[in-house]
Amino acid sequence: MPRSPGTRLKPAKYIPVATAAALLVGSSTLFFVFTCPWLTRAVSPAVPVYNGIIFLFVLANFSMATFMDPGVFPRADEDEDKEDDFRAPLYKNVDVRGIQVRMKWCATCHFYRPPRCSHCSVCDNCVEDFDHHCPWVNNCIGRRNYRYFFLFLLSLSAHMVGVVAFGLVYVLNHAEGLGAAHTTITMAVMCVAGLFFIPVIGLTGFHVVLVTRGRTTNEQVTGKFRGGVNPFTRGCCGNVEHVLCSPLAPRYVVEPPRLPLAVSLKPPFLRPELLDRAAPLKVKLSDNGLKAGLGRSKSKGSLDRLDEKPLDLGPPLPPKIEAGTFSSDLQTPRPGSAESALSVQRTSPPTPAMYKFRPAFPTGPKVPFCGPGEQVPGPDSLTLGDDSIRSLDFVSEPSLDLPDYGPGGLHAAYPPSPPLSASDAFSGALRSLSLKASSRRGGDHVALQPLRSEGGPPTPHRSIFAPHALPNRNGSLSYDSLLNPGSPGGHACPAHPAVGVAGYHSPYLHPGATGDPPRPLPRSFSPVLGPRPREPSPVRYDNLSRTIMASIQERKDREERERLLRSQADSLFGDSGVYDAPSSYSLQQASVLSEGPRGPALRYGSRDDLVAGPGFGGARNPALQTSLSSLSSSVSRAPRTSSSSLQADQASSNAPGPRPSSGSHRSPARQGLPSPPGTPHSPSYAGPKAVAFIHTDLPEPPPSLTVQRDHPQLKTPPSKLNGQSPGLARLGPATGPPGPSASPTRHTLVKKVSGVGGTTYEISV
């Protein structure tokens, strides 16, 4: 009497089986209580024993026939034979012992019924060797329970014969007392047994015939094999033996165990705990033809370990240059040279058109960020372990790095201060974009250590990245190629003109290595601007398209005319140069990367002289003013492919009040150093195709602490080059408080070129 899952309980179908069980158990119990005691004394003690054994056998077979699986075939899935359900023929013929047997398609179970299988309309299942559905046992009679049903009929018939026979003996011996209770109950049991004896004996005889002939009730009723040969018969004895002694057929449908549903309820507003080591999430990205597999490990514990990291780690190890990859471009330089800081870092282009043509380059070490008021000392540079590196890749925009590229530098950044004005609000927006740009590079995270200047107050802003903090991956022009590291000697990140240089050593050199010039302790500064020679960014043109180079060539003539105008301006101002407004990030390190003769440094005056100086808001040199206007307008058209926090410094540079700055002096030891090798040029586009940007010879003054206001500063409007401020893009030297500069000034020409889509590039000559 197994019930298929999902069917409703129908109480009416249990009425026949409940009646049969009640009559069987009730009548037999009355017989054993009221009749068997006298039969035991008068006839034989074997009478109740015999009837008891037969009764137990009847109950056992009845239970097996009722609760046993008759051989139900499992239904096919909805989509398993969906096509066959519409196109399959209704019948198929198979050979059984050389006889064609027809199989019918079952539209309910979605398969062809095996031979002798039929679908039960009551149970709604296809049953193997289906005989019939018996309501007295409330179950189908099939291959697996037919044996117990047949034995139930035989034992029940024998039990009924015994009850009627021994009851008749008791009544005949108590004929004078028919009104007695024992005689009345015995006569009632005899009537019930005799009433059901006729159909039971008839049904038993019918199944005896079917068993001996090897047929089922369904085959007999439907007329199968009538007048023909039954392919399933085994002979009379063989059929009886097969029914009574054959092994039990396997069960095809196994009901799942009904276990109590354990549901763990958690109170609301509580987030589930994250695993400390979650499995990496593989993300397949498709953008601009580039597909990269990224492994992101998101876990709460990895973020917690970042804060728990000790702050006593040493500086990062020198880079390991991979030989054999673009050997013409990656020449292994000597340590300490300018090429050693540049050859191992390449930049991926920010324009989508260049993503398809990026070769893989080896990576270099990552140098920590410095913000205003914050500086990373050399020997105490802090790096995190690899276990925390890969766990910090919580990025809102996944990077598009190549799959074979190792972990890049994801730079630690601090949230900006609350905006106090419109300029601060604009700088905060730029800083948030810079966070996204810097977080696209997964890898080494560097902790920061704040540093305050000795004589200046802490600055109110924070910056995002330092000149040599971003990793480069190929040789195209992009946001990061303008941020290549400067001299191996290393410089302090200028948080403000008032912040001085603390003894920072480059991660590429040992703190005590040869060639590291001595650095005196910072002295008190005077409120003047120090020398700020400009240096071009070492960029590569290997991956530039022909369209960009054609645009470069088209603008060559116009830029040559502008250079002539700027040369006239240089003759007017002598040793003055064209610079941006003094900001914290316009003072960058790059002097060792330049080419050309040295020139004396410029000494800057106060902000009032800068504004009132020639070429800035005055009519002393209209030609220079026109060239500066056209230059700033072309620069300002650069798309914001990536943002930085330099606009915050521009806001501070425009604020009224005196500007503390580093002195315009050098130590005698630094003045006599030879010029290091120049920036390597691209083998593809070097020579006549390179053009120049304004950069005049700057006379270097002798060491002095006097404030000179002779030469005003030329100021260009704040603009962005390839998504960054020009001060950061040109990598000027980092200036600290009065004292020796980190690197001598060198003359270099830089060309600003507009590419496809308005992108502006700087090309060094």
Curated annotation (Swiss-Prot):
Please give the residue positions where the record annotates the modification Omega-N-methylarginine. R441
Q: Where in the cell does this protein reside?
A: Golgi apparatus membrane; Mitochondrion membrane
Membrane-side (Cytoplasmic) residue stretches: 1-13, 74-148, 212-765
Query: Which key words are in the record?
Result: Acyltransferase, Golgi apparatus, Host-virus interaction, Lipoprotein, Membrane, Methylation, Mitochondrion, Palmitate, Phosphoprotein, Transferase, Transmembrane, Transmembrane helix
Q: Which family does it belong to?
A: Belongs to the DHHC palmitoyltransferase family. ERF2/ZDHHC9 subfamily.
- GO MF terms held by the record: palmitoyltransferase activity; protein-cysteine S-palmitoyltransferase activity
Pfam families hit by this protein? DHHC
The biased composition feature labelled Basic and acidic residues covers 301-311
Protein species of origin = Homo sapiens
Annotated catalysed reactions: L-cysteinyl-[protein] + hexadecanoyl-CoA = S-hexadecanoyl-L-cysteinyl-[protein] + CoA
Coiled coil start-end: none
Positions of the region Disordered?
A: 293-352, 509-540, 613-747
- What's the top EC group for this one? transferase
> Which of the residues are on side Lumenal?
35-52, 170-190
Query: Which InterPro entries does the entry mention?
Result: Palmitoyltrfase_DHHC (IPR001594)
Q: Does the keyword Ligase apply?
A: no
What protein is this chain from?
Palmitoyltransferase ZDHHC8
